[in-house]
UniProtKB/Swiss-Prot annotation:
GO biological process assignments: Mo-molybdopterin cofactor biosynthetic process
Record-given protein name: Sulfur carrier protein FdhD
Amino-acid positions noted as binding Mo-bis(molybdopterin guanine dinucleotide) in the UniProt annotation, renumbered to this chain: F259, C260, R261, R262, G263, R264
Gene Ontology cellular component terms for the protein in this record: cytoplasm
Subcellular localization(s) per the UniProt record: Cytoplasm
UniProt function note: Required for formate dehydrogenase (FDH) activity. Acts as a sulfur carrier protein that transfers sulfur from IscS to the molybdenum cofactor prior to its insertion into FDH.
GO molecular function: sulfur carrier activity; sulfurtransferase activity
Length: 276
């Protein structure tokens, strides 16, 4: 490890990784080395004083997470329905994100409120009824196109928003691509759903409307649903897509592309938005 680096990985005054002494096994040799470990902390989203969900996440860009989660979960329809967001460190080693909703939205939330302890890879923990899993989303229009010839360069650009991942090998990334294939911005997190929610918050903040989403993970149905909820018509995933992701993408008119690697990709649904 470079001795000029801090003992903690510090990003914009937020500690997102720590030093850890490890034993590296290489061939027949065991050697003690310092390594970076990505921080994973409990983050509670609290709406109008009532805890709604606890997710395991990287302690960075939590305001964006609050906005993105609220939008992708249908808690709000517009960021204007959030009156304030405050980040409060908890005495239990976690973080509370205190979100003040408009009265109308909070009343609606109370009607459908669920208490759940989320995990890094879990998007439906604590959902009380199966009907709540599939949200009624209007089919997306066909207004966006994207050239697959731009994908290789986009994959290279994705590395620029994976600062924590480069040092720890432990995070997922989600990025917004312009129709010309330029990376407009991105977010990373130990949880793939959280990384996407943070991106949705960033997309809302920056008012991006045209383009596509690129994620470093697989495409589960939750990733498809969150993308559709924010109006994205195209979702590129570095890894595979699940059967339910393909089914939901078809239902929402979302173009789903998996196995995005240099020189190749697999188009699962609605290829008409893609050009060579």
């Amino acid at each position: 490890m470079d001795e000029t680096k801090s003992t903690n990985l510090l990003t914009k005054r937020v500690i997102v990784g720590i030093d850890q002494t490890t034993v590296q096994h290489k061939g027949s040799l065991n050697q003690a080395e310092q390594d970076y470990i990505a921080l994973e902390v409990p983050v509670a989203l609290v709406y109008n004083g009532i805890s709604h969900v606890v997710m395991m996440a990287s302690p960075k860009n939590l305001e964006l997470f609050a906005v993105g989660f609220s939008l992708s979960e249908g808690i709000i329809g517009s960021s204007n329905e959030i009156r304030s967001i405050e980040i409060v460190e908890s005495c239990h080693g976690g973080t509370e994100v205190q979100i003040e909703l408009s009265s109308r939205r909070f009343m609606q939330l109370k009607e459908r409120r669920r208490s759940m302890a989320g995990r890094t890879g879990c998007g439906i923990c604590g959902t009380e009824q199966l009907a709540e899993i599939f949200r009624p989303i209007a089919p997306l229009p066909f207004t966006q196109t994207f050239s697959l010839s731009l994908l290789d360069n986009a994959l290279e650009q994705l590395k620029t928003v994976q600062e924590i991942g480069e040092l720890t090998g432990c995070t997922h990334a989600a990025a917004w691509l312009s129709p010309e294939g330029q990376l407009q911005g991105g977010c990373e997190d130990v949880g793939r759903h959280v990384a996407l929610d943070k991106l949705i918050g960033l997309k809302t903040q920056q008012k991006w409307t045209e383009g596509a989403i690129l994620v470093s993970s697989r495409a589960s149905y939750e990733m498809v649903q969150k993308s559709a909820m924010c109006g994205a018509e195209i979702l590129f995933a570095v890894s595979a897509a699940t059967s339910l992701a393909v089914e939901v993408a078809n239902q929402y008119n979302l173009t789903l592309v998996g196995f995005c690697r240099r020189g190749r990709a697999t188009v699962f649904t609605h290829p008409q938005r893609l050009t060579d």
